[in-house]
């Protein structure tokens, strides 16, 4: 096989996998509709679960007032 033939085969394989892996709009709308309906239940909101809105959370009160003490940096190249 020559280089031109190998390149043509490569392009056809890439094109075929792209066409096969791209879902059609009709099929994807039906599957994603159920996910979008319950998305609010699955994704917790940081604002509604912290700072006094929900007392059962593990959020420290200093986060609400931005008064948490800063942790000392560990020595290393990334902290320079």
Swiss-Prot record:
What does the comment on domains in this protein's record state? The cysteine framework is IV (CC-C-C-C-C).
What does the record say about PTM? Contains 3 disulfide bonds.
Instruction: Summarize the protein's role.
Output: Neurotoxin with probable activity on sodium channel. Induces intense repetitive firing of the frog neuromuscular junction, leading to a tetanic contracture in muscle fiber (spastic paralysis). In vivo, shows the same effect as the whole venom when injected on fish prey.
Where does this protein come from, organism-wise?
Conus striatus (Striated cone)
In which broad location class does this protein mainly occur, judging by the first location in its UniProt entry? secreted
- GO MF assignments: acetylcholine receptor inhibitor activity; sodium channel regulator activity; toxin activity
Q: Which residues carry this modification: 4-hydroxyproline?
A: 55, 60-61, 69, 72, 75
| Name of the protein in question | Conotoxin SIVB
Residue numbers of Pyrrolidone carboxylic acid PTMs: 39
Q: Further notes on this entry?
A: Is only found in C.striatus specimens collected from the Hawaiian Islands.
- Going by the entry's taxonomy, the superkingdom of the source organism is recorded as Eukaryota
Q: Which residues carry this modification: Proline amide?
A: 75
